[in-house]
């Protein structure tokens, strides 16, 4: 678990993640998730991009949980807005706006009949989101009462 600027991250074991910056800028511009799982909270303002094997996710100040594998990427927009695009089919795009884990998605590898599809909420907790937001002096929009695990 760590903080970069006003963003906080919880990287699960056996994950491989690269942090992206432009030139010598101190600001994070995005992440490349090579494999594994990461829960992230991002401050509003600057746009960032998360790249996984099968998906590109445009961040607009939000919280996301991502599981990246070679055959699919799981994306839960815990709250906020993201733009999800398939890397295997650039025409497969979706804007997701949520308040509280409303629309998790799978983004499939190329060749799948449907590139972006609904998914269940899995493997992350509201308590983890509350902790990450607290590290950067914020609270999640759903509050702190009765956190639960999915």
Model-derived features: where do they sit?
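Flexible, surface-exposed loop/linker segments and immediately adjacent secondary-structure boundaries
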Residues: 3-150
């Amino acid at each position: 678990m760590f903080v970069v600027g006003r963003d906080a991250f919880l990287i699960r074991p056996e994950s491989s993640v690269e942090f992206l910056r432009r030139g010598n800028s101190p600001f994070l511009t995005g992440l490349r998730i090579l494999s594994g799982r990461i829960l992230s909270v991002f401050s509003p303002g600057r746009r960032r991009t998360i790249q996984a094997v099968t998906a590109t996710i445009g961040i607009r100040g939000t919280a996301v949980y991502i599981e990246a594998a070679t055959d699919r990427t799981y994306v839960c927009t815990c709250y906020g807005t993201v733009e999800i695009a398939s890397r295997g089919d650039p025409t497969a795009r979706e804007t997701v706006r949520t308040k509280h884990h409303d629309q998790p998605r799978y983004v499939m590898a190329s060749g799948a009949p449907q590139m972006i599809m609904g998914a269940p909420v899995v493997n992350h907790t509201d308590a983890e989101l509350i902790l990450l937001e607290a590290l950067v002096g914020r609270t999640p929009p759903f509050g702190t009462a009765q956190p639960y695990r999915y």
